[in-house]
Structure formats: C-alpha cells, structure tokens
A protein has these predicted regions:
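Hydrophobic alpha-helical transmembrane bundles of multi-pass membrane proteins
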Residues: 1-413
Length: 413
C-alpha cells in the first residue's frame, strides 16, 4: 500500500505539471502573435482544457483504452461511455499497483488536451472561434484516442511485427505531438495564411509578435511541464527510470536550443531568439518517444538534430506558403517524426527492424490523421466556414469574436 501511495502521488504531481503546460502554451502563443488577438488565444486554450477533459471523460478514455471490448480487433474498440473502474476494480492491482484508475484518467486527459492546443497555435489570428471549437472537439473526440489506442491501448501498433517487435513511443512524440501537428498542417492548408504574411511574389514577410519576453516565459514553463509529461510516462516513481528520463529530457531540450540557434546563425547570420526557443521545444518533442531508452549522449544528438529540423522546417513551410505563427508544426510534427524514428537509430531499441516499424507506424498514423483531419476540416468549413473576413482580421479577433480588448485602453502601435 505504501508503494502504491508513493507511485500515485508522483503521478498526481506529474499530472499537475502537464496541466501547467497549458499556461506555457498560452504564454508562447500570446507572445508570438499580435496584441489584438490575445483574448482569442486565451479563450481557445481555456476551451481546449475544459472541452478536452469532458470529452475524454465521456468517451475518449474508453475509446483509447477499450480493454477487451474490440469492435475491429486491434484497430478500434470502445469500453462504453463515462468513467467506471468496474466491479472487479482493485487499486492495489490496477496498473501493477502503480497508480489508481482515477489518476490514470486525469493524467491521460491532460495529454488529450495537448493535441488540440497544438492546432490552436498554428491557426492563430485568422480562424473563426466557432470553427476552431468544432474542429478541436472532433479531433480530440475521434482522431487522438483512436491513434493512441493503437499502441497505448494495446492495439496493432504494440505488436506490429510480433509480441517482441512493436512500435515504441514512450510519451507521445507521434501519438500526441505528431497527431496534433498533422491536424494543424491540414487546417492551415485549408485556412490560408494571415493577411500580409506573403507579398505578391510569395516572399514571406515578418509579422512580429507582441511580447517576446512572455513567449520566453512560456517556453520555460513548458520545459518545466515536460518533467511531468515524460517523468509521468514512466507510470511509477521508480527512482532510476524517472531520473534517467528527466536527464535525457533536459539534455535534449538544451541541445535542441543550441542546435537551432547555431544553425540559424549559419543560415541567416542572425541569433534568432524565437528559433532558439522553438529549438528547445523541438528537442523536448524529439526525446519524448525514447526518453527512457536513451543514454545522455544519444539524447544530445536527438536534441541537436531536432534543433536543425526546426530551422529547416520553418523554411519549408515558408516555401510552401503555409503560415504557422508560433512554429507549432516544425516543433510538434517534424520533430515528433524525427524523435520517433530516432528510437530505431539510437538507444536500447536501435536496429533496422525497429527503425522500419517506427517508420511504418509514423506513416500509418500520419495518413489516418490527414484523412480524418481533412474530413473534419471540410465538414466544419461547409457548415460554419473557417476564416474570419479581412475586416475582422484587421481589427483583431479580440474585438471581432469577443467584443473586447485584452489590455483596455493600453495599446502598442
């Protein structure tokens, strides 16, 4: 009983840290966008948390963890609506005594909200609030739990080749971050760029954020929250495993920041703080798939490459005329893919067969997210539309969608 209590307390602390990450996401988005859209961003982030928990409680948790209630074996299952540990529930045997059923739900519920938050940042400053809420609801209700069930719920990813050779994603480089990133990519493709982002020749133009110090604070809060995101994914308070997981997490974050800063200096002859910050986040996302499998040196390599991936993928989006105001897609999608593949290249599971499993499952998850993300986006577009009109975009979504300003009479011109 004492071991259960210790493990459960650790899991609850980690749950609180993951919840705290939503403040970091809010600060990051506010700082990297314009003042006239602050309330809109805060509203979306509050909605994501509240909606995510209700949806995950209502059916998402049992869709992601169906147990023996399969509809399509290994692909889709559903254990019924609501939360119910069952008549045979024993807190001492649940999850091998690692934590209680209720802690399990709450910890995983925080992850569900994160996937929708990734979409929020990428679509900032031009999406209709009702359209965003509909897309976020459907994505969290359908796409996220189904993809998650393929590994974490005991689906076909977990035994992709055999019982001993399955997909591995420790804390969600693909199952959380890339899932959110694919959704964001689909939505911004149909949504279009912000007014003034590209000139008549298609050249990208800078739209400066309103508060870089606030976005920097957001990144540091997110880094702190990752102690819970990855540390909690150990699913116990095992001192050795939690310690090495947090060490690799921090080293990858540090290396990601350095990698992005140095590479952007080489390419653009500029020490770009926003690249530095997103490099840190890219390192965190990259290590998330294999944080428990890596030695410190491998974590540094993963982080350094993730930093380079961030810089290159920002340039790629600009080349494709895709507008992502906060860099959510470079950080969460591209670094999520890299980190997932790195499990097959570095660490305890490295090997050709494991790499091919990782590659195949990344492709399957991506294809599923793109197909269903496109269907959801086009469905919402047909009913509600996606984008505010040019006048509303120019005024700012705070006034256009919410009828008020974030800072009252204070303004920056």
């Amino acid at each position: 009983m004492e071991l259960l209590t210790t493990n459960n307390v650790w899991m609850m602390i980690c749950t609180a840290l993951v919840f705290f990450m939503h403040l970091g996401f809010s600060f990051l988005e506010i700082g990297l966008t314009r003042q006239k859209n602050t309330i809109n961003i805060l509203f979306k982030n509050f909605f994501v948390i509240t909606m995510g928990l209700i949806v995950y409680c209502s059916f998402g948790f049992n869709l992601m963890y169906p147990g023996d209630f399969d509809i399509i074996d290994g692909v889709l299952g559903f254990a019924g609506p609501g939360l119910d540990p069952g008549i045979d529930y024993n807190q001492l045997t649940y999850a091998d005594g690692g934590y209680t059923y209720w802690t399990d739900f709450l910890f995983q519920g925080m992850f569900a909200a994160t996937a929708a938050t990734i979409i929020s940042g990428a679509v900032a400053e031009r999406i209709k609030i009702n359209s965003f809420m509909a897309i976020a609801f459907l994505y969290v209700a359908i796409v996220y739990p189904i993809v998650g069930s393929w590994q974490w719920g005991g689906g076909f990813f977990s035994t992709f080749i055999s019982e001993d050779l399955g997909f591995y994603d420790f804390a969600g480089s693909t199952l959380v971050h890339s899932v959110g990133g694919w959704g964001a990519l689909v939505v911004i493709y149909f949504l279009g760029a912000r007014k003034g982002k590209f000139d008549s020749d298609g050249k990208p133009l800078a739209i400066p954020g309103s508060n870089i110090p606030l976005s920097a604070a957001g990144v540091l809060i997110l880094w702190l929250g990752w102690f819970g995101f990855n540390g909690g994914s150990v699913l116990s308070a095992d001192p050795e495993l939690t310690s090495i997981t947090l060490v690799t997490t921090c080293l990858a974050a540090a290396a990601g920041g350095i990698g992005a800063a140095v590479f952007s200096r080489i390419l653009y002859n500029n020490l770009d703080l926003t690249m530095f910050m997103n490099g840190v986040l890219g390192g965190l996302v990259g290590i998330t798939a294999g944080a428990d499998q890596m030695l410190p040196g491998s974590a540094i390599i993963i982080g350094l490459i993730a930093g380079v991936v961030v810089v290159l993928s920002v340039a790629l989006l600009d080349k494709c005329k895709l507008d992502d105001p906060v860099g959510a897609i470079p950080v969460h999608l591209f670094c999520g893919i890299w980190g997932t593949l790195a499990v097959g290249l570095l660490g305890e599971k490295a090997g050709f067969e494991q790499f091919m499993v990782q590659l195949a499952c990344v492709g399957i998850a991506g294809l599923f997210c793109v197909i269903f993300g496109t269907a959801i986006t086009l469905f919402v577009k047909s009913i509600l539309g996606l984008r505010v009109d040019e006048i509303e975009e120019e005024r700012g979504l705070d006034l256009a969608e919410h009828g008020t300003r974030a800072y009252g009479d204070f303004s920056i011109n």
